[in-house]
A protein has these predicted regions:
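Mobile gating loops/cap/lid regions near enzyme active sites that modulate substrate access
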Residues: 292, 296, 315-316, 324-499
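Surface-exposed patches in mature extracellular/periplasmic domains of secreted proteins
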Residues: 173-186, 200-202, 306-307, 343, ...
Length: 499
């Protein structure tokens, strides 16, 4: 489903517009799609993003855009004009400006634009919510399996520069910044074939990891004036309408791309040692103590060696850390600060899915139902799945029309309640009627969003003290070596003769 159907090209800044036929007699709501792909891959041309079924069924206008990804869209040398970073996000903003100026010509209503996206696309939607110049270009937002506060979604300016200079080194370009020239660095990168840059991107990551990407948005003080967490905490979201959600097994897809013992070609029944190693890959850049806390929380201590339980636990670690708990945190903060929020968990595994059963409902596999792919007669979906896809398209279109996914013509049917910070109500989306639940993986998310930050904060001073002690020790050690060398040199000299 994710395989590219076009050649790699730097000539990529296009958008697509679908309009219902016959054309509506009055302006119709507009849905604008941003694809995911970890900010390193993706294209609006993928078959799964075909908008014809959604548009014809719900008579909305649908727009999808391309934006630059990887180093082409997110390489950053903060402080330089040549590569300021976040140009992929600026591509998206430009598309939103185009929609405001032109969508009326396609029957769309520029005063009723809903921005929706999945994974990195959802994180992008969130960043536009947090960036004032973007905020006025759309009116509602849908974030599917991603959030701007995810640990993978942004980097700081220092790390962004390190990655840029590392890529330059890998392709034989001079370093920028201190001791170098950013203009020369960027000019050199422009002489390298696009495929050479793509082939070297993954080598700039600081350590082995899953669900981490080389070139992502940077907290630059411009597009993002502060970290997403700080902007979410400080924001005023009164009047905003947001739909957020996750799939049942967010982590499983990523494990087959680098976690020890995992493969899409077998049952991935891992050992305890592989689980422990997998935690370090799944939660990179944390201290040993924090990793131990993750292991403690996710181990089933009645069956600590059971391979299937360990496999499921590591899937939960990766999914909770990167998707579920950032989304839950975002939903709670937005709701507490005045937004009207609706939340879901997508729990249906498609009958056509080729991934092994142990992967459950993987990351990204709600999209085909949102876009109505089961209505394509050439596909082999079941009748129940076609009905399910029609339901989901109606929910998304209702939200685009009114800010409420519920069916206004059926007030006695199952109702989707708003998500609040207190009640934390969400719905399960599968072939059955809506089921309302409470607490989106509340225990796990209390660990990630409450306990672990406090643990890291409490141990930061210890870590800093240890770093200072080590620095002083190494300085003292080097002095001792120098003194010993000087003493040895002196002791070998001829002694002064008696005067």
């Amino acid at each position: 489903m994710w395989n590219p159907n076009r050649e790699l090209s730097e000539d990529c800044l296009y958008l697509n517009v679908w309009t219902p036929y016959p054309r509506p007699t009055s302006p119709t709501p507009v849905l604008v799609w941003i694809y995911g792909g970890g900010f390193y891959s993706g294209a609006s041309s993928l078959d799964v993003y075909d908008g014809r079924f959604l548009v014809q069924a719900e008579r909305t206008v649908l727009v999808s855009m391309n934006y630059r990804v990887g180093a082409f869209g997110f390489l950053a040398l903060p402080g330089s004009r040549e590569a300021p970073g976040n140009v992929g996000l600026l591509d998206q903003r430009l598309a939103l400006q185009w929609v405001q100026e032109n969508v009326a010509a396609f029957g769309g209503d520029p005063t009723s634009v809903t921005l929706f996206g999945e994974s990195a696309g959802a994180a992008s939607v969130g960043m536009h919510l947090l960036s004032p110049p973007s905020r006025g270009l759309f009116h509602r937002a849908v974030l599917q399996s991603g959030a701007p506060n995810g640990p993978w979604a942004t980097v700081g300016m220092g790390e962004a520069r390190r990655r840029a200079t590392q890529l330059a080194h890998l392709v034989g370009c001079p370093p920028g910044g201190t001791g170098g020239n950013d203009t020369e660095l960027v000019a050199c990168l422009r002489t390298r074939p696009a495929q050479v840059l793509v082939n070297n991107e993954w080598h700039v990551l600081p350590q082995e990891s899953v669900f981490r990407f080389s070139f992502v948005p940077v907290v630059d003080g411009d597009f993002l004036s502060d970290t997403p967490e700080a902007l979410i905490n400080a924001g005023d979201f009164h009047g905003l309408q947001v739909l957020v959600g996750v799939v049942k097994d967010e982590g499983s897809y990523f494990l087959v791309y680098g976690a020890p013992g995992f493969s899409k070609d077998n049952e991935s029944l891992i050992s305890r040692a592989e689980f422990l190693a997998g935690v370090r890959v799944g939660v990179p850049q944390v201290s040993d103590l924090a990793a131990e806390a993750v292991v403690l929380h996710y181990t089933d201590w009645l069956h600590p060696e059971d391979p299937a339980r360990l496999r499921g636990a590591l899937s939960d670690v990766v999914g909770d850390h990167n998707v579920v708990c950032p989304v839950a945190q975002l939903a709670g903060r937005l709701a507490a600060q005045g937004a009207r929020v609706y939340a879901y968990v997508f729990e249906h595994r498609a009958s056509t899915l080729s991934w092994p059963l142990w992967m459950g409902v993987p990351h990204g596999y709600e999209i085909e139902f949102i876009f109505g792919t089961p209505l394509d007669p050439s596909r082999n979906y079941t009748t129940e799945e076609k009905i399910f896809a029609q339901r989901l398209m109606r929910y998304w279109a209702n939200f685009a029309r009114t800010g409420d996914p519920n069916e206004p013509r059926d007030p006695k049917g199952p109702q989707w309640p708003p998500y609040t910070a207190g009640a934390q109500q969400y719905v399960s989306l599968d072939l059955r009627p809506l089921e309302v639940r409470r607490g989106l993986r509340a225990q796990a998310c209390a660990f990630w969003n409450r306990f672990l930050p406090k643990l890291l904060s409490a141990t930061d001073t210890l870590d800093e003290a240890e770093r200072q002690w080590k620095a002083e020790f190494h300085r003292w050690s080097s002095y001792m070596v120098h003194w010993k060398n000087q003493f040895d040199h002196y002791s070998k000299q001829d002694r002064c003769s008696d005067l």
